[in-house]
């Protein structure tokens, strides 16, 4: 399958650079999975599309302030580290700027020595493994010394870092936000629960690979990045109960969808599980775990566009995106939302 089949022209001014003042003021494009009918709504109208007994699945990961600015201990040259993935102990996979200045044994200091890191390995694709040394709690130092990494297409400074977190963010470990969840307020979640919809929290720590363009010309040749996920016994029980009683499983975001599909693919049922997933969903894939999907509008030729296409069909997806562009919906992380209704 040619990657170019998932390309489309997006006016640059439709790429949202800042979040709306009120989370729930986003627009919502509703697409019926069966009929492909499209309707323009506002985000709080999501409640009307949900039924008692449905299960709304949210990713409670929390974005790390993963960008660190430090200096080489030996030369005082400025070095930027971007934490990608925690390995064993205090070792992290990172991206470094400028990479050419960092070799095995290079020591970098942050915050006048509050945090130091030594390069222990150079990866084939250019990344670096660093082992961190510190006193105290690592994530507290990260909160103090780090800054929030924003997607490369966002050029404006984020005034309030909390706006790149969901209101229910809890499990720290992501390099990027699960952006479909940014539209929810605490009040809206209470109203959804009051309707009889079950809310389930699962965890998938989002890696920066989510922004990596597909470099292969054929979809099937793309190598998907791996991300850590966890689903608890309580979450699995609620999901299984909803399915057994005829409720729809609605994934909030592609991260929730990938987590649930991983578990169903591996176990054939909703069970408690944790591990690393590199599941790649594109047209031809048969969804087993989810019935509906709430998601943002994604980049052309991205794996996320492919994932959504697998749920409603490529033609229906492209029709919906053409409508969204015509109606001036806001795209990408701080943009509007799309609900694929079961």
From Swiss-Prot:
Keyword Protein biosynthesis: no
Top EC class for this record: transferase
Annotated metabolic or biological route of this protein: tRNA modification; tRNA-queuosine biosynthesis
Keywords annotated in UniProt: Cytoplasm, Queuosine biosynthesis, S-adenosyl-L-methionine, Transferase
The protein's Enzyme Commission number: 2.4.99.17
Gene Ontology CC: cytoplasm
Catalytic activity: 7-aminomethyl-7-carbaguanosine(34) in tRNA + S-adenosyl-L-methionine = epoxyqueuosine(34) in tRNA + adenine + L-methionine + 2 H(+)
Gene Ontology biological process: queuosine biosynthetic process; tRNA wobble guanine modification
Recorded GO MF terms: S-adenosylmethionine:tRNA ribosyltransferase-isomerase activity
InterPro entries: QueA, QueA_dom1, QueA_dom2, QueA_sf
NCBIfam families: PRK00147.1, queA
Complex formation: Monomer.
Protein function: Transfers and isomerizes the ribose moiety from AdoMet to the 7-aminomethyl group of 7-deazaguanine (preQ1-tRNA) to give epoxyqueuosine (oQ-tRNA).
Family statement: Belongs to the QueA family.
Protein name: S-adenosylmethionine:tRNA ribosyltransferase-isomerase
Name of the coding gene: queA
């Amino acid at each position: 399958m040619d990657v170019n089949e998932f390309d489309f022209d997006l006016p640059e001014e439709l790429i949202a650079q800042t979040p709306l003042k009120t989370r729930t003021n986003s627009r919502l494009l509703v697409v019926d999975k069966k009929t492909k009918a499209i309707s323009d709504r506002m985000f709080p109208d999501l409640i009307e599309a949900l039924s008692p007994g449905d299960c709304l699945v949210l990713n409670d990961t929390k974005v790390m302030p993963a960008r660190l600015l430090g200096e080489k201990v030996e030369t005082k040259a400025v070095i930027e580290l971007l934490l990608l993935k925690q390995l064993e102990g205090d070792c992290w996979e990172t991206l470094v700027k400028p990479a050419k200045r960092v070799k095995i044994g290079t020591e970098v200091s942050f915050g006048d020595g509050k945090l130091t890191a030594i390069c222990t390995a150079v990866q084939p694709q250019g990344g670096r493994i660093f082992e961190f040394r510190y006193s105290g709690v690592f994530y507290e130092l990260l909160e103090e010394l780090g800054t929030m990494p924003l997607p490369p297409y966002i050029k404006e400074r984020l005034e309030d870092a909390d706006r790149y977190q969901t209101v229910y963010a809890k499990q720290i470990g992501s390099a990027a936000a699960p952006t479909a969840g940014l539209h929810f307020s605490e009040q809206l979640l209470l109203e959804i629960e009051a309707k009889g919809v079950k809310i389930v929290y699962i965890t998938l720590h989002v890696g920066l690979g989510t922004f990596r363009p597909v470099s292969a010309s054929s979809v099937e040749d793309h190598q998907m990045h791996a991300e850590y996920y966890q689903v608890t016994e309580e979450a699995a029980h609620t999901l299984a109960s909803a399915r057994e009683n005829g409720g729809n499983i609605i994934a909030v975001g592609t991260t929730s969808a990938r987590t649930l599909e991983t578990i169903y693919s591996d176990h054939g049922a909703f069970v408690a599980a944790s591990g690393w997933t590199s599941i790649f969903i594109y047209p031809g894939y048969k969804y087993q775990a989810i019935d509906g999907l709430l998601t943002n509008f994604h980049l052309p030729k991205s794996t996320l566009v492919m994932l959504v296409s697998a749920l409603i069909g490529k033609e229906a997806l492209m029709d919906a995106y053409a409508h969204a562009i015509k109606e001036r919906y806001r795209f990408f992380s701080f943009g509007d939302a799309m609900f694929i209704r079961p």
